[in-house]
Structure formats: C-alpha cells, structure tokens
Amino acid sequence: MRKIYNFSAGPAVLPEEVLEQAREEMLDWHGSGMSVMEMSHRGKEFMSIADETESALRELAGIPDHYKVLFLQGGASSQFAMVPMNLLGKKGKADYVNTGQWSAKAISEAKNYGSVQIAASSESDGFNSVPPLAQWHISPDAAYVHYASNETIGGVEFQWTPDLSAVAGDNKNIPLVADMSSNFLSRPFDVSKFGLIYAGAQKNVGPAGLVVVIVREDLLDIPPLAGTPAMFRYKTHADNASMYNTPPTYAIYIMGLVMEWLKKQGGLTAIEQRNIAKAKLIYDLIDVSSFYHCPVNQADRSRMNVPFTLSDPGLDDAFLKQAQAHGLIQLKGHRSVGGMRASIYNAMPLEGVQTLVTFMREFEKNHA
C-alpha cells in the first residue's frame, strides 16, 4: 500500500488495484509473452483490449448505439480546435458558455475558425458560479453550444445538464458539446442529451496521452472546414475504429482496467455517492471555519476540485510542507489563483480525504 495521498489536479491518482494489475501484466499480458507497450495496435491482442475498453465504457455510461466512441491523442486541448473544425460547417458560428480558464481556452481557440458568441458567463462574479440556464442566450443560427462541465482551476462544476430546448427557441435541436475532462464518469449522465463529449483521460479514467470523444453519428456528416487535416477529422477516426494511426495503446489499456475497477465499485451511481461524501467532508470543514475559505457559490462547488485559501497567505508554505510530511501531496493551488486545491477524483479513497481533513483541523488549531 502506498504511503502518500496524491491530490494532483492531473495527471492524477489512479486506483491502486489498477496499478498493481498493470505491474503484474507488464512483461507478459495474458500469456502473450508481450507487454502491452510492445503490441501491434492492429494485432488481435491489442484489438481485444481496445474492444473491451470501449464495451466497458459503453456499459458504464449507457452510450447509445448511434454514438461513436473515439480514442484520440492530443488531450482535451486538441479538442478546442477539432470541435469547431468539424462542427461549425456552413454556419460558421458557435455559442460558448464561459465559466473559467478552460472555457476561455476553448473560446480563444474557436475564434480562429469562426464567429463565437458568449451565450452566458460568470465572469462578473470572478467565475465563482455557474450561469443559470434562464440567463443563457442561444443564437438562432449557431452550429453548437459548448461548455466545460467542471473547471479544475476555479473549482466550479455544473451539477445539472443544460436542457437547450428550454432556451434555444427555433434552434432547439442545436447540439450540446461538453468538455468533461475533469468530471467524466464521476456521476451518471445522459449521453443522449449531448451531440459530442470529450474528456482527457488523465484525471478520472487513465494516464496522460489519451482523449476520449463520444460523438453522435449524424454530426460526422457535417463537412469539416476547408483545409482540415485528415488527422483532425472525427470521421477519419470513426471510419477507422480509432486505428487510422497508432493510438495511445498503453493509455487505452490502463483506461480499460479503470473501467473494470469502476464496475467493481458499483458503477457511476455508486461512485457519485462516494464523491459526494468525499467533497462534503472538506466543504463542511471549510464552512464552519474562519481559517479556511472557498469562494465558490455553494450550489456550484466542484466535487472533483476543492480550492481553498488560508486566512493568512503567509502560512501557505508551512501548510504545504507540513501536509507533505503527513503524506498529503500536490495540494498547491493553480499558479493563477494561489492558495490550495485538493483534487479528489474517483480514485482518491475516502481515507485520503479523511486524512486531509484531520490535518486541516490540526493545522488550524495550531495556527489560528
């Protein structure tokens, strides 16, 4: 058993059971005599790994048959460009919801390919909330609406799925696109409500190097923008079962192990309850304390990333140093906001959060 609890925002902690299985299979996967790292991506051994990973994901998330699952490279940041390149089509315009730094990065990239309207924003309150759906303004001619379901830096999370039919007027069938990189598979979600979902793997489902895309098949018929390279066309990868080029094979293998681990935990409903309990422990401590502070609106607080500050920033270094001595690492907040951040993704055990909360109480007692 490892002696530390890793609260990194990503790449993040993986289930210990998964790492142990990967270690056992490192030199010889299922009697093949090969490591997964050495396998041909078109060989029967790896093809079975890829198929089983996709099947497990479809089962866990309830992905309908008319959606394609793509295993791609380039991380979620590549999707900031691929989404507009593939979905803008002749409309040339898209709506984006701005709830923080990752939303802003997606918006900035999309502007290279077409017109972007900000459908809603929480900038006025410092990105400490989620804009209510009633405040969204959907363009009648937008090709899609994009939002980030969880902002890892600001600790803001959508606790609901936007129902665009309620606010889109005549454009009620507009596709909803979601960057789910940091809360993917942390709770049940209805895939049929989305046109496209993308998620970098390195927070909740695997190691860095893999991005998962779930796309409704009809959207693959939209002609990509002129000059879009084959590698940046969703249809290229859908038509070739994510094997157009060599995919990130080992990352897909680890993701498959994580899918099986999630199933053993009871699936997404069970993991959601665990995530709620973990987040509640930290937020409850913060809310009764005058020593710790979280600026995020309570209804919009992230279950995955808990940002907090100390009443005296001069104690930050001492907090981090003493936390590390207690086996609690990677708690430093993002450089753009400072303070602390505890990322408590699916694989973070309840015991890790309990240990953190105990340390926070002790630190407050000694320094308040």
From Swiss-Prot:
> GO molecular-function annotation terms?
O-phospho-L-serine:2-oxoglutarate aminotransferase activity; pyridoxal phosphate binding
Checking Pfam families in the record gives: Aminotran_5
GO annotation, biological process: L-serine biosynthetic process; pyridoxine biosynthetic process
Q: What is its EC number?
A: 2.6.1.52
Presence of keyword Magnesium = no
Tell where it localizes. Cytoplasm
Tell me where in this chain the PTM N6-(pyridoxal phosphate)lysine is found.
K203
Q: Which reaction does it catalyse?
A: O-phospho-L-serine + 2-oxoglutarate = 3-phosphooxypyruvate + L-glutamate; 4-(phosphooxy)-L-threonine + 2-oxoglutarate = (R)-3-hydroxy-2-oxo-4-phosphooxybutanoate + L-glutamate
Going by the entry's taxonomy, the superkingdom of the source organism is recorded as Bacteria
Q: Coiled-coil intervals in this record?
A: none
Query: What cofactors are annotated for this protein?
Result: pyridoxal 5'-phosphate
Residues binding L-glutamate are R42
Binding residues for pyridoxal 5'-phosphate, per the UniProt record?
Answer: A76, S77, W102, T152, D179, Q202, N245, T246
Cofactor notes: Binds 1 pyridoxal phosphate per subunit.
- HAMAP family reported in the protein's UniProt record: SerC_aminotrans_5
Subunit structure, as described in the record: Homodimer.
Tell me, in a sentence or two, what this protein's role is.
Catalyzes the reversible conversion of 3-phosphohydroxypyruvate to phosphoserine and of 3-hydroxy-2-oxo-4-phosphonooxybutanoate to phosphohydroxythreonine.
Q: What is this protein called?
A: Phosphoserine aminotransferase
Provenance organism: Nitrosomonas europaea (strain ATCC 19718 / CIP 103999 / KCTC 2705 / NBRC 14298)
Gene transcribed to yield this protein: serC
